[in-house]
Amino acid sequence: MRMIPLTLALALSGGVATSALAQDAAAAKALASKNACLACHAVDKKLVGPAYKDVAAKHKGQADALAKVSARIKSGGSGMYGPVPMPAQPNLKDEEVRVLAAWILAGAPDQ
């Protein structure tokens, strides 16, 4: 699991084979499903929370995007995407938070 953020980052720069990215994306999506993230978020449309593609677009080009999205996942908050607060996710391990944040910032790819 520790290679997922690295693999996604390399994929964004064009340095990783598609099959490795597909495996990492599938693992990240499974983690999102297991932790009920997909109850409030979808990849390309707003549900209760913002679409993952909108989150990726909002943070595109920001050097601290991974840290910001990771903090939002772990601590929750409100006001950034509307009035509905995102609950904190204190039970997620830091590595799981980074995996989810990297996947979201990559546009939550299936492959």
What are these language model-derived features?
Residues 1-7:
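Positively charged n-region of N-terminal signal peptides that target proteins for export
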Residues 7-15:
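Bacterial N-terminal signal peptides
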Residues 16-22:
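Sec/Tat signal peptide C-region and signal peptidase I cleavage site
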Residues 24-43:
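Sequence/structural segment immediately N-terminal to covalent heme-attachment motifs in c-type
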Residues 39, 45-59, 72-99:
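Axial heme c-ligation environment in periplasmic c-type cytochrome domains
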Residues 58-68:
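Short microdomains enriched in Cys/His and/or Lys/Arg
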Residues 108-109:
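A residue-level marker of the well-folded mature domains of exported/periplasmic proteins
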